[in-house]
């Protein structure tokens, strides 16, 4: 018999399965493979068909921290060139796209929008990946000059992982079903 994993109880179960021993920033990084950290992000926004993950950290970038609540999950990345928390990546049920421009998508199943607040002296803005049931917002403040490389490194580092693959992993490993 399979039991659904949902709400606070589901988050707690996945968190306890995912967090053992000492917790370092790298230990809480949601990597792009099925498992606890990614499952916790998925459960925070149960309608999201895609979940942000870190596929490979570029040279000069570090994972800072992860914050997960019901209805939202976010994490921060530090850069040796752009500073601490140079980028924030947030998963939510929806995004405010007012003033954003549709740009070429990088992920299958998602539309990408961009809104820039400043080009100089710092490159400041947000990129939005919008998909069924959710949105990932990338907020960044990057050093002008090397900003194009930093911007590309950020978007190369973060990918979108299919919720369905996570659900199958949890079902196979734990005998539990994700909500909804």
Can you say where each PLM-predicted feature lies in the sequence?
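Short conserved aromatic/hydrophobic patches within beta-strands of well-structured domains
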Residues: 22, 57-62, 154, 158-162
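Bacterial lipoprotein signal-peptidase II cleavage site
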Residues: 23-31
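Residue-level signal for mature regions of secreted extracellular proteins and peptides
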Residues: 15, 25-26, 46, 88, ...
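A short, solvent-exposed beta-edge/loop patch
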Residues: 109-180
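Surface loops and adjacent helix of pleckstrin homology
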Residues: 27, 66, 141
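Sec-dependent bacterial lipoprotein signal peptides
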Residues: 1-22
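Short, solvent-exposed recognition patches
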Residues: 33-125
């Amino acid at each position: 018999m399979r039991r659904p994993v949902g709400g606070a109880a589901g988050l707690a179960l996945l968190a306890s399965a995912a967090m053992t021993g000492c917790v370092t920033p790298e230990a809480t990084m949601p990597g792009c493979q099925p498992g606890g950290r990614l499952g916790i992000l998925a459960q925070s926004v149960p309608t999201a068909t895609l979940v942000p993950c870190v596929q490979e950290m570029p040279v000069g970038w570090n994972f800072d921290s992860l914050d997960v609540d019901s209805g939202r999950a976010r994490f921060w990345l530090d850069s040796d060139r752009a500073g601490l928390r140079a980028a924030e990546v947030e998963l939510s049920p929806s995004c405010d796209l007012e003033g954003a421009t549709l740009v070429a998508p990088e992920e299958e199943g998602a539309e990408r929008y961009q809104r820039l607040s400043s080009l100089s002296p710092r490159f400041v803005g947000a990129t939005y990946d919008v998909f069924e049931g959710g949105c990932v917002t990338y907020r960044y403040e990057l050093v002008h000059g090397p900003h194009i490389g930093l911007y590309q490194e950020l978007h190369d580092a973060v990918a979108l992982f299919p919720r369905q693959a996570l659900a199958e992993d949890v079902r196979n490993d734990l005998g539990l079903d994700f909500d909804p």
